Amino acid sequence: MVKKYVENGDIYWHSFPHNAQPELMNQAFLVRGVQSSQNLAKKYNAPQISKVLSQRDVPGLTLGSIVPLVDNGVIGISIGANDFSPPPIVPSTMDCYVKGLRTVRTPFLWKDVHNNKSIIVDIHPGG
């Protein structure tokens, strides 16, 4: 029964098998996690394979995450930083601090200049 809902696109998951702390992983572990989610989507005939990594209740992740994610088909990261770990001051959260707004966000392109690879990031203050 679950397989039917996956095939219909009613059940969907992000590009990693769990809410992780990528800064604590080496590249091989990060790649393995992304591939695990991709393989699961293929196994259950999901209509598409997720290209966005979702992280919740984390303050962010390291620059070292960009290359293994991009090399394995991930094009975006959605970060939900809870109120106890404030999000970093980046373009997508600037208005939240400067003007006191919580709803104005703009995704930004995070680039690893050493490897010339980039990924879209959207940080959601408050989770």
What are these model-predicted stretches?
Residues 1-127:
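Catalytic-domain carbohydrate-binding cleft regions of carbohydrate-active enzymes
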